């Protein structure tokens, strides 16, 4: 297995099917671990979290990543996310996927780069 023991928390949430976690704060490492595992950590103030907690279990809450909104039956809330992470999540990209977007440029660079170790 790869990753630190701290990453197990994010893996556990992902294994249970969580796609979004709304909290008052996140530690930097956990926040990034959630993002790296395809989840969306959203920071919201207590007031918003309390309003969401008061909803009925049958009420549907939707998180619109593109519009950066949490949509509940009674109210909408906005949230912030880094534009690069937003792009990665919307396009199901990880670091390898991002690198592969530049595959042709990498190959072209490798072709023109001198091979100093070869005579």
UniProtKB/Swiss-Prot annotation:
Q: Which NCBIfam families match?
A: leuD (TIGR00171)
Q: Which gene encodes it?
A: leuD
Alphabetized InterPro entries for the sequence: 3-IsopropMal_deHydase_ssu, Aconitase/3IPM_dehydase_swvl, AconitaseA/IPMdHydase_ssu_swvl, LeuD
Please give the subunit comment from the record.
Heterodimer of LeuC and LeuD.
Q: What is this protein called?
A: Putative 3-isopropylmalate dehydratase small subunit
Q: Where does this protein come from, organism-wise?
A: Streptococcus pneumoniae serotype 4 (strain ATCC BAA-334 / TIGR4)
Top class in the EC scheme: lyase
Q: In which pathway does it act?
A: Amino-acid biosynthesis; L-leucine biosynthesis; L-leucine from 3-methyl-2-oxobutanoate: step 2/4
Q: Which GO terms describe its molecular function?
A: 3-isopropylmalate dehydratase activity
Q: What is its EC number?
A: 4.2.1.33
Q: Which GO terms describe its cellular component?
A: 3-isopropylmalate dehydratase complex
Q: Give the domain of life.
A: Bacteria
User: Any idea which UniProt keywords this protein has?
Assistant: Amino-acid biosynthesis, Branched-chain amino acid biosynthesis, Leucine biosynthesis, Lyase
Classification via SUPFAM superfamilies? LeuD/IlvD-like
**Gene3D superfamilies for the chain:** Aconitase, domain 4
Question: One GO BP annotation here?
Answer: L-leucine biosynthetic process
Query: Does this UniProt record's set of keywords contain Ribonucleoprotein?
Result: no
Q: What's the catalysed reaction?
A: (2R,3S)-3-isopropylmalate = (2S)-2-isopropylmalate
General function of this protein: Catalyzes the isomerization between 2-isopropylmalate and 3-isopropylmalate, via the formation of 2-isopropylmaleate.
Query: Which Pfam families does the entry mention?
Result: Aconitase_C (PF00694)
Family recorded in the similarity comment: Belongs to the LeuD family. LeuD type 1 subfamily.
């Amino acid at each position: 297995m790869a990753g630190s023991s701290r990453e197990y928390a994010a893996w556990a949430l992902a294994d249970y099917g969580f796609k979004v976690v709304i909290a008052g704060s996140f530690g930097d490492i956990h926040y990034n671990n959630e993002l790296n595992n395809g989840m969306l950590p959203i920071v919201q103030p207590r007031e918003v979290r309390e309003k969401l907690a008061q909803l009925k279990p049958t009420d549907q809450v939707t998180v619109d990543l593109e519009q950066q909104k949490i949509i509940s039956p009674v109210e909408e809330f906005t949230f912030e996310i880094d534009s690069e992470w937003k792009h990665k999540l919307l396009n199901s990209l990880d670091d390898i996927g991002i690198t592969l977007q530049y595959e042709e440029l990498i190959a072209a660079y490798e072709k023109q780069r001198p091979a100093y170790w070869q005579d």
